[in-house]
Structure formats: structure tokens, C-alpha cells
């Protein structure tokens, strides 16, 4: 789980984890794709019966607009989601130049007790007003991977009390709604596995409740050859019948012998067979400060071909 840090220009860093070119999809480029239909879920960002495919883009030596243009040329399509990371006290954006793409903001958390107790309400209100001014429907992922021990807002670093996270999340939700940020869809997004992996730190302990969550997210990377099913099925099984699922961070590293292309093919197949997944966001960067890994999907011609095949398939035309 890389964690990009502050502001959209800062590089995040992938989530902590435990540890051959894909075939053409049926009807790939020439496919006549009917319009996607809404599923009735997702709040301000409605889930469709097709997958929205997007990315966190931080390509070395390129601006966001240059990176978007490169991916447009390579894939023959737009990013449906553009993911950015913003610090807890940073001034949130009220406008972003990403065309028709849906903005996803991962908003860093902070120590939980002051948030839960109201001492950080002014920060929350300022963020709510800025994002309300954005006006367009967008996704907000606050204090992600709370079931891990690598962030200051993680439950294990806050008295091992998941209830503090739940209270803080609900408070933020209420303040956003009170300040007119009705365009903001709330994403609750644990890591695929918990650290420590104990019953007291189980991801479900941190769930704020259906009334406070529009989408359920999950972070999971191919660090140790885990399959997409291994990474995402626990969240899909627990929440997929109630909320649309967004894979908020994922990517593969190259283990050799075409492994990245093969894994992308497996990701495509898993998502195509999992109707509750409504969005997938690739962690598309080669400048991760705390990692030697290159998460770009164009590190080889076969990996690019596999990703292009996925991006052009009907299931990913949301």
C-alpha cells in the first residue's frame, strides 16, 4: 500500500500487504458498447453496471495533463477516475482540470481522538466548504487503511480502539452534509489484510455503518504474487451486497517472465466475474518515494497490451 503523501503532486505509497500478455477481451476495440446503467447505489457518484477505470497518476518527469495525454494515446480512452492525495491540513481543491473524469480525493487522517471529540471541526468544515464548491460529484476517501499499523490514524496507533475511527468518520460525514457538500460520496477503504491480524483489529470493527458510506474501497497490491481474488474477495464478500466496491489502490510489480501482464489479465478476469465491483483505480507511478517498485502498467509491451485489453473491454466502459 504505497502512500502518496500530501497534495496531488506528492507521491503516495502503496498499501502494506502480506506479501504473459492477457488475451483480447471479446469484442475489444470494435465493440459497440451500450450506455452503462445506474445500479441505484453509490450516492452522489452512482455506481453503474460497468466498471469505472482510472488511476493515481505520478509519472516521472510529466505533469498530470501530460500523463493523462500519454494514457489517452496508449489506451484510446479517458481515465474515468483521477485519484489525488491531500494532506489533513492542506487547502482542498475547489477546481481541478481533469475534464469529465471523476475526482477521487484521498484525504490524509490524523490522530483520531481530537477528530472524534470535535477539536478538529474547523479543519473539517473548511474542507467541506471547499469540496462543496467543487460542485461536481466526487469521491472522498478519508483515513484509508485504518486497519493497518503504518499510518498515524490507524487503529493500532490510536489506543487499539476502532470505535474512535467510527466516531471520527461519522463526525466528518455529518459536518460535510451540514456544510452543503452533497456532491461528495464517502468511501470507507480498509487495507485488504489487517496488521496486526487479530480479531480486535478486524476490518469490520472500523465500519462506520451503511448510513455513512456510499462506496466501500480496498487497497491491494501484487507484492508477493497474491491473486486479485485473494486481495479483494474478503471485502467483496462482506460488503458487496450492500455497497458498490471500488478498488481504490492496486498495481502489480514485475516478478519476471511476464508476471505483470499475467496479473493484469487475472485482475480483468476477476473484476469481470464480480458484479459488485464498480470501479478500479490503478496506482500508476514510477516515482514512489519509499519504494523501488515501478507500478506503471507500461513497463513492458505485454503488460501494456494486457492493460489496454482490459481498458477497452465492455465491462470496463463505465
Model-found features: residue ranges?
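Aromatic- and acid-rich polysaccharide-binding/catalytic face
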Residues: 79, 203-226, 283
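Acidic (Asp/Glu)-rich catalytic clusters
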Residues: 69-77, 90-104, 126-136, 205-211, ...
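N-terminal low-complexity, Pro/Thr-rich disordered segments
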Residues: 1-51, 312-318
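Substrate-binding cleft of extracellular glycoside hydrolase catalytic domains
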Residues: 92-190, 294-302, 307
Amino acid at each position: 500500500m504505497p502512500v502518496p503523501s500530501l497534495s496531488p503532486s506528492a507521491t503516495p505509497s502503496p498499501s502494506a500487504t502480506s506479501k504473459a500478455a492477457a488475451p483480447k477481451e471479446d469484442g475489444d476495440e470494435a465493440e459497440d458498447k451500450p450506455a452503462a446503467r445506474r445500479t441505484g447505489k453509490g450516492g452522489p457518484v452512482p455506481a453503474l453496471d460497468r466498471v469505472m477505470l482510472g488511476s493515481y497518476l505520478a509519472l516521472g518527469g510529466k505533469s498530470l495533463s501530460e500523463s493523462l495525454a500519454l494514457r489517452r494515446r496508449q489506451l484510446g480512452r479517458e481515465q474515468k477516475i483521477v485519484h489525488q492525495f491531500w494532506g489533513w491540513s492542506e487547502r482542498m481543491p475547489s477546481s481541478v482540470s481533469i475534464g469529465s473524469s471523476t475526482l477521487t480525493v484521498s484525504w490524509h487522517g490524523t490522530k483520531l481522538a481530537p477528530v472524534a471529540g470535535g477539536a478538529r471541526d474547523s479543519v473539517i468544515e473548511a474542507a467541506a466548504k471547499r469540496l462543496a464548491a467543487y460542485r461536481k460529484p466526487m469521491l472522498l476517501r478519508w483515513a484509508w487503511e485504518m486497519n493497518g499499523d503504518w499510518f498515524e490514524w490507524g487503529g493500532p496507533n490510536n489506543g487499539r480502539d476502532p470505535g474512535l475511527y467510527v466516531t471520527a468518520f461519522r463526525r466528518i460525514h455529518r459536518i460535510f452534509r451540514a456544510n452543503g457538500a452533497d456532491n461528495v460520496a464517502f468511501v470507507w477503504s480498509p487495507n485488504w489484510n489487517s496488521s496486526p491480524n487479530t480479531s480486535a483489529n478486524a476490518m469490520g470493527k472500523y465500519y462506520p455503518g451503511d448510513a455513512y458510506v456510499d462506496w466501500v474501497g480496498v487497497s491491494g497490491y501484487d507484492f508477493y504474487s497474491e491473486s486479485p481474488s485473494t486481495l479483494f474477495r474478503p471485502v467483496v464478500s462482506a460488503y458487496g451486497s450492500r455497497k458498490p466496491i471500488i478498488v481504490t489502490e492496486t498495481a502489480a510489480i514485475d516478478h519476471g517472465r511476464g508476471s505483470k501482464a499475467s496479473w493484469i489479465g487475472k485482475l480483468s478476469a476477476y473484476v469481470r466475474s464480480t458484479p459488485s465491483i464498480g470501479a478500479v483505480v490503478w496506482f500508476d507511478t514510477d516515482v514512489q518515494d519509499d519504494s523501488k517498485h515501478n507500478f506503471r502498467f507500461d513497463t513492458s509491451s505485454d503488460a501494456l497490451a494486457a492493460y489496454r485489453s482490459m481498458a477497452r473491454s465492455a465491462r470496463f466502459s463505465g
